[in-house]
Amino acid sequence: IVKVGKNHQDKFKPGMKFTLQPALNYKGTMWSPGYSYEFFGGDATYCIIPSEVMELGCLLEYKGRAYYEASLAEPMSCSIGAFNAAYHTKMGVYTHQMGIKEGGKLAIMAGAGPMGLGALTYALHRDIRPSMIVVTDLNQERLDRAASLFPPEEAAKDGIELHFVNTGKLEDPVAELLKISGGTGYDDVLCYAPVAQVVTQSSAILGRDGCLNFFA
């Protein structure tokens, strides 16, 4: 923070580090930093913080050592939201069981990029975990890096069967992914690329009562 207006000097001081809650939800609008304001967000070196950000308490003091940790809060919250938005049902019961299926099978399609890996680390380390996670991508280098960051043998210690699959090398990706699932299909599928072929594959590998999130 470089300069603080008189109305906020009791809480903020020049030199303080901060991060933002960008989902303002101000009076029902979709306004957000980087898209909706001329002098706020994006690649600006200096910003003027709009009054609504202060009104909503969305300017947050940051006391961490690494800036990247603060910058990951928003994208990770999006992936966490996707896990929480998933739901499943039981026959004859008209209620939704929110969240991914505990002990189920999870596929993260086109998932070896930054957002997919964020979803993977959350799936591996949260309280409610699947029994199987399959991460697909077309880029072998990214898959190899993902496997080095999240070794399947480490996941196995927590009872999770972890697979990294290059669908670009498969003649029939859907058939192979279904085979990996044991023929049941997947309880939860997260699609991390806005590519028609990936979306189609995501739908095709769903199991009974499966939940598909078009994340990208």
Residue ranges, per PLM feature:
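Adenosine-nucleotide cofactor-binding segment
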Residues: 102-104, 109, 120-199
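Glycine-rich beta-strand-centered segment in the early N-terminal region that forms part
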Residues: 1-24, 40-41, 60
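ADP-ribose/adenylate-binding Rossmann-like module
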Residues: 188, 204-216
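Hydrophobic/small residue at the entry helix of a nucleotide-binding pocket
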Residues: 78, 114-115, 142
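Glycine-rich Rossmann-fold phosphate-binding loop(s) that bind the pyrophosphate
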Residues: 75, 110-113
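NAD(P)H dinucleotide-binding glycine-rich loop of Rossmann-like/cofactor-binding domains
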Residues: 21-103
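Generic structural signal for buried aliphatic residues
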Residues: 18-19, 106, 212
